[in-house]
């Protein structure tokens, strides 16, 4: 047998063996051989993750160089939200969304929302010059970043520590009313300042009345009392700003004045005894007819006595929340940082929530509401957009009480260059505070959603798995009867199943953005970004400072001095005429049906 014949026989044998193996395998179907790979043309879903080129096109890539930033070098020229990162050698490249968007971050307690996400974002905000507000339950963020923001980035820093009010900066919520009233009083021709004082007085009154939640529609038949109470509050805030001493012009003085004005007074000019009138009506009678405070209080002033008392009681009930000796140390003095300074200069406001005292949580809602409304006024003065982007880092957004009008904030603020980053632990928190419709409005207006690190029993993981969508994958079945067979088909499979979401490693998050495919985004611990902390930012203990209030008598005296022509004297004839007014005679019944 020649060598060529031998080679041919061997080749034929090999082919025969391969055919036998192929025949065996074709009849030995296994379920393990069916892989869930992407197939088809999107018949059951087109969900997929973004490609590298799509990520590069969607997000700005910024070198995250903390060392140089803190020296004032190579500061970023873009502003926005840090949503992810990638490593390039020893350098870290941040993925930044520079759009006017709101962000919703969802993650269970302990997944690293602060260490992985919040700290890099605050560092970037400081480096890019964005003013920001940050809520903090532990106080760690302001202690770590207060000094850095002030020392390296030249920020105005204000800490409102509701846990330790004597170690807190002041926040007089009437500050802007007082400021513009002083400008107007120094120049009576400056009507713009007067109008701003009136506008901020109405904003403050509306914010206070809405502390309890609801609006005119929710109050139903009682809507009149709440609307009238709002006008009454605005009226007294204006009067306090106009006539009060500098250290008396605060919200607790308003409470005291309303309480005092409930008491009846008798005019000293009366010759004979007459029925006493309420202190509130006596005060309003001393004002000129064209005084705006009198107009604002018109609903209450022209109501029946009982209705007017109900209006004043409604206002008092809303102000009860401010009656706290510790809170007075924050509310009754100056203001470290107002809305105008916050928008025009690099500024940071840290609000510390006491986890052990939920009775003070309303202040967070109040501060955010008032600051937001005042920012809108500033934006309108600048053509509808702020000159510099403002960030609200609302950590524990689902923990503190409902922010009245939060749905409108998420809907309307984006176009004004206000970005809200709401950090929650689950959708159930939003549902509890804002209801099903409120939750949907908030989630529908957050163009960025970042999530990861779910608890084993998390229901939010199911919601987000569904939100990621489905992809078309291969599936099939195998039969091992008399004749072995296999069938293949296309099915829809979630892009990430619930168990895959729950088993994601710490530091890995999913980022979804409107109009783009989602991406798996790794985030590093803050020290791997190059972030280091220095000495903690601590405010000095100011001690218990004496609080002064404006009294009803002082206010009436100042009004009489300013408007002496409004003093009224009641003549003896007028009083006699009032007393001798004939009573309605009762007509006797004479019969009939």
Predicted regions and their residues:
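Short, surface-exposed polybasic-aromatic patches that bind anionic ligands, especially phosphate groups
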Residues: 524
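Short intrinsically disordered, low-complexity coil segments enriched in acidic
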Residues: 2-3, 463, 467, 516-519
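Conserved ATP-driven motor cores of ASCE-family P-loop NTPases powering translocation/secretion/packaging/pilus
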Residues: 410-510
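Low-complexity, intrinsically disordered or weakly predicted helical/coil tracts enriched
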Residues: 32-37, 41, 150-152, 173-181, ...
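P-loop NTPase motor domains
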Residues: 82-90, 94-418, 433-436, 496-520, ...
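A short glycine-/small-residue-rich loop at the edge of a beta-strand within enzyme catalytic domains
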Residues: 68-70, 362, 397, 455
């Amino acid at each position: 047998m020649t060598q060529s014949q031998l080679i041919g026989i061997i080749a034929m044998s090999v082919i025969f063996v391969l055919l036998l193996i192929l025949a065996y395998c074709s009849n030995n179907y296994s379920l393990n051989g069916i892989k869930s790979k992407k197939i088809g043309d999107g018949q059951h879903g087109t969900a997929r993750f973004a490609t590298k080129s799509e990520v590069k096109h969607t997000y700005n890539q910024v070198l995250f160089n903390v060392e140089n930033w803190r020296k004032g070098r190579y500061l970023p020229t873009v502003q926005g939200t840090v949503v992810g990162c990638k490593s390039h050698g020893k350098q870290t490249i941040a993925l930044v969304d520079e759009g006017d968007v709101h962000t919703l971050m969802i993650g269970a307690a302990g997944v690293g929302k602060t260490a992985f996400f919040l700290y890099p974002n605050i560092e970037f905000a400081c480096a890019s010059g964005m003013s920001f507000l940050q809520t903090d339950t532990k106080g760690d963020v302001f202690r770590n970043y207060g000094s850095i923001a002030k020392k390296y980035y030249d920020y105005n820093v204000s800490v409102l520590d509701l846990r330790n009010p004597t170690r807190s900066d002041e926040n007089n919520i009437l500050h802007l009313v007082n400021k513009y009233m002083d400008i107007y009083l120094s120049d009576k021709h400056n009507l713009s300042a007067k109008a701003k004082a009136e506008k901020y007085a109405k904003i403050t009154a509306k914010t206070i009345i809405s502390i309890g939640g609801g609006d005119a529609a929710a109050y139903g038949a009682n809507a009149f009392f709440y609307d009238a109470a709002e006008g009454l509050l605005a009226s007294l805030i204006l009067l306090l700003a106009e006539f009060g001493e500098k250290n008396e012009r605060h919200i607790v003085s308003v409470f005291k004045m309303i309480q005092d004005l409930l008491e009846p007074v008798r005019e000293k000019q009366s010759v004979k005894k007459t029925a006493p009138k309420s202190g509130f009506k006596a005060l309003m009678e001393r004002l000129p007819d064209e005084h705006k405070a009198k107009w604002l209080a018109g609903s209450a002033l022209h109501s029946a006595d009982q209705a007017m008392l109900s209006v004043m009681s409604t206002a008092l009930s809303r102000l009860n929340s401010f009656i706290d000796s510790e809170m007075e140390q924050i509310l009754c003095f100056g203001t470290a940082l107002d809305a105008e300074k916050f928008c025009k200069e690099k500024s940071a406001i840290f609000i510390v929530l006491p986890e052990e005292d939920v009775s003070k949580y309303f202040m967070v809602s109040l501060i955010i509401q008032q600051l937001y409304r005042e920012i809108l006024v500033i934006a309108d003065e600048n053509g509808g957009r702020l000159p510099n982007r403002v960030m609200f880092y609302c950590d524990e957004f689902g923990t503190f009480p409902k922010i009245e009008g939060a749905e409108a904030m998420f809907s309307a603020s984006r176009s004004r260059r206000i970005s809200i980053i709401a950090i929650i632990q689950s959708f159930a928190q939003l549902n509890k505070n804002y209801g099903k419709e409120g939750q949907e409005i908030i989630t529908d207006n957050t163009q960025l959603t970042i999530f990861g690190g779910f608890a084993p029993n998390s229901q939010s993981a199911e919601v987000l798995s569904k939100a990621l969508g489905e992809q078309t994958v291969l599936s099939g079945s195998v039969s091992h009867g008399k004749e072995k067979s296999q069938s293949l088909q296309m099915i829809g499979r979630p892009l990430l199943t619930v168990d895959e979401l729950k088993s994601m490693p710490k530091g890995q998050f999913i980022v979804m953005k409107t109009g783009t495919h989602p991406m798996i985004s790794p985030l590093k611990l803050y020290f791997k970004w190059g972030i280091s902390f220095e000495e903690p930012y601590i405010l000095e203990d100011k001690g218990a400072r004496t609080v002064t209030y404006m009294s009803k008598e002082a206010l009436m005296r100042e009004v009489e001095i300013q408007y002496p022509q409004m003093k009224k004297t009641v003549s003896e004839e007028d009083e006699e005429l009032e007393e001798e007014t004939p009573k309605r005679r009762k007509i006797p019944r004479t019969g009939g049906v």
